[in-house]
Curated annotation (Swiss-Prot):
One of its GO terms (molecular function) is RNA binding. GO terms for biological process: translational initiation. Residues 11-85 form the S1-like domain. The keyword Transferase does not apply. NCBIfam families: eIF-1A, PRK04012.1-1, PRK04012.1-3, PRK04012.1-5. This is Translation initiation factor 1A. Keywords: Initiation factor, Protein biosynthesis. Seems to be required for maximal rate of protein biosynthesis. Enhances ribosome dissociation into subunits and stabilizes the binding of the initiator Met-tRNA(I) to 40 S ribosomal subunits. It comes from Saccharolobus solfataricus (strain ATCC 35092 / DSM 1617 / JCM 11322 / P2) (Sulfolobus solfataricus). One of its GO terms (cellular component) is cytoplasm. Gene3D superfamilies: Nucleic acid-binding proteins. It comes from the Archaea. Pfam families: eIF-1a (PF01176). Belongs to the eIF-1A family. The gene is eIF1A.
Length: 108
């Protein structure tokens, strides 16, 4: 018996927005060993670390838009919290959280 056709609808989940101590960044360079260099919306380059919880679930590459949590005791370093997909980036642009020009400029 064939399987039933089910509508392929993406679940509409909330897109994480930056809170205090968090910012949106673009991956600039992969360093290896779960470290990357990211260019943030505040204009700073930071050394980012991929925590073990998302290391194997989420693959990163240059040009990806990510949400990072900035370290309190070392503001030039951060942890990757979430990787935005293309549809989520569009939702952030539509909600005026970020502008398309800034993302294009950060991506180079």
């Amino acid at each position: 018996m064939p399987k039933k056709d089910r509508a392929q609808e993406a679940p509409s989940r909330d897109v994480p927005r930056p809170e205090e101590g968090q910012t949106i960044c673009v991956v600039k360079k992969m360093l290896g060993g779960d470290h990357l260099i990211v260019l943030c919306m505040d204009g700073k380059e930071r050394l980012a670390r991929i925590p073990g919880k998302i290391r194997k679930k989420m693959w990163m590459r240059e040009g990806d838009v990510v949400l990072v949590g900035i370290w309190d005791f070392q503001p030039n370093r951060c942890d990757i919290l979430y990787k935005y997909g293309n549809d989520e980036i569009k939702r952030l642009v539509n909600e005026n959280i970020i502008s398309r020009e800034v993302i294009d400029q950060l991506r180079g």
